[in-house]
Regions:
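Short catalytic/ligand-binding loop motif for oxyanion handling, primarily in non-cytosolic enzymes
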Residues: 18-21, 40-42, 92-95, 115-120, ...
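Conserved phosphate-donor/acceptor-positioning beta-strand/loop module used by diverse small-molecule
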Residues: 87, 98-124
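PAPS-dependent sulfotransferase catalytic domain
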Residues: 62-78, 119-200
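PAPS-dependent sulfotransferases, especially Golgi type II membrane carbohydrate sulfotransferases
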Residues: 1-7, 152-155, 163, 167-173, ...
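Glycine-rich phosphate-binding loop used to anchor ATP phosphates in small-molecule kinases
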Residues: 71-97
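PAPS-dependent sulfotransferase catalytic core
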Residues: 1-71, 78, 126-128, 220, ...
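Short beta-strand segments
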Residues: 9-11, 84-87, 109-111, 180-182
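PAPS/PAP-binding and catalytic site of the sulfotransferase fold
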Residues: 16-30, 98-102, 180-205
Length: 279
């Protein structure tokens, strides 16, 4: 199997990672899409061979690295793409492993104001009135918008984990591998954003059709008790709406967009505050 080039997509949920994957996959040289299981498989293998397990003395460092590289090779063996963008929110928390396994890899981190992330997830929840979605495991978490948003913001949950992992990566030793892409700029200026992404990953530019973008994963969404979680509308455009969150809940999360004012951070940023410079 010819060597593939690997890059990664991560960041916050409901912030354009599936949309970005749907756009990138228009390029016949690229493979991209919704979250893959690779990051979870890497974590599982590391857990199995780490100190405290009976396998730790049987698998040395070089063997571990070869096994983990083999996960990528095996998972993408039937994929003919030259360049793979593997998506998972966990990559920002495992960026050291990523850098060791794929020294030239870059990571595109999609972000969005956290208040609007919560708004989007709340809309998903309310869209299935007679379904207990997989987002919340018990009645106490599902009870109200207050308990739902608080649960999602926990450090080991959908929004909180991704947010904290991104903060860690932005000030880590591999921050120069990161490009932060604000959802609002992606949907309002997609051609410019994609051009910057191509420059960042060092690939020749490709002319994308932002009027005919498509992606859907109904089987995956159905197992979560949700509808359209990974459905991408054909046209990339701004869609304005009024929030359905109570004002106090919205205000609680609207101030958390730390990427708009990053100091001493080596990450490349395409964010709202500096949209004209894409600094």
């Amino acid at each position: 199997m010819p060597n593939k080039t690997f890059h990664f997509i991560s960041g916050l949920p409901r912030s354009g990672s599936t949309l970005l994957g749907a756009i990138l996959r228009q390029n016949p040289r690229f493979s991209a899409g919704m979250s893959s299981p690779i990051a979870n498989l890497v974590e599982g293998v590391v857990n199995q061979v780490s100190a405290g397990s009976e396998l730790s003395r049987m698998v040395d460092g070089p063997q571990r690295e070869r096994i983990l590289k083999g996960l990528f090779d095996s998972y993408y063996a039937d994929n003919s793409a030259e360049v793979v963008f593997d998506t998972n929110r966990g990559w920002t928390a495992r960026i050291s492993e990523m850098a060791t396994l794929h020294p030239k890899a870059k990571i595109i981190c999609c972000v969005r104001n956290v208040a609007w992330v919560m708004d989007s997830l709340e809309r998903q929840f309310r869209g299935k009135a007679f379904e207990n979605t997989g987002l919340f495991p018990n009645a106490s978490e599902r009870a109200t918008v207050y308990t739902r948003t608080e649960a999602l913001a926990a450090s080991n949950r959908l929004v909180g984990f991704a947010y904290q992992a991104l903060r860690e990566a932005c000030w880590g030793e591999h921050a120069d591998r990161i490009m932060i892409v604000d959802y609002d700029i992606l949907v309002s200026r997609p051609a410019e954003v994609l051009g910057l992404i191509y420059n960042f990953v060092g690939e020749p530019h490709f002319e994308h059709d932002f009027e005919q973008v498509s992606y859907d994963a109904p089987a995956f969404d159905e197992q979560l008790g949700l509808d359209g979680l990974h459905r991408v509308r054909p046209k990339v455009e701004v869609s304005s709406r009024k929030t359905i969150l109570p004002p106090d809940v919205f205000e609680k999360y609207v101030q958390l967009a730390f990427w708009q004012d990053l100091k001493d951070c080596a990450a490349f940023r395409i964010v709202a505050k500096a949209a004209e410079q894409a600094d």
